[in-house]
Amino acid sequence: MKRIISVILAAMMLFMIAPTAAHGKRAESRAPYGYVEHEYDQLLAFMEQTNSAGVKNGTQLSSAYDPNDPETWGGIFWYIAPTGFIHAEYIFFSTYDFPNRNLVGTLNLSGFSKLRALGCAGNSITAVSISDCPLLDELNVAQNLLTNFSVSNCA
């Protein structure tokens, strides 16, 4: 009887650990607990790009910008899915929302499964790549310095 109870307790402990492992960080990702790793990594790459004065996009969007804390990344509205994972749902980097920010570089939003809108008009972004975003129904990338723009497999 003791052995059966021990096995049951061990199994219960395994099931309690499993969701934590699924939400945990991979060694190569710095994504905080719960955030979808590839979304975090791709947005972080954009936030860390610097303009000619050496100012990061993240700092342009928020004076409280902390690369390790997505809640400080201006212009992104997060969605907590029933699974517990945190996705980017709305991204607004346009000059209408953040005047005189002049964001630069490339923005890759491929595989953002919960993304519904992107607004990044009026900046100096040179490339935007969006694919496999089935919920995306609003997109405004006007008045940028785009040399590369691609959209595929979106709503």
Where does each model-flagged region fall?
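Short, intrinsically disordered, charge-balanced linker/junction segments flanking boundaries
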Residues: 148-155
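Residues on the solvent-exposed faces and adjacent turns
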Residues: 95, 122, 132, 143, ...
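Canonical leucine-rich repeat
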Residues: 106-107, 128-130, 149
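Consensus "Asn ladder" position of solenoid repeat domains
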Residues: 101-102, 123, 141-144
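N-terminal capping/linker segments that flank leucine-rich repeat
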Residues: 4-8, 13, 19-117, 134
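Consensus positions within tandem repeat domains that build extended binding/scaffold surfaces
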Residues: 119, 138-140
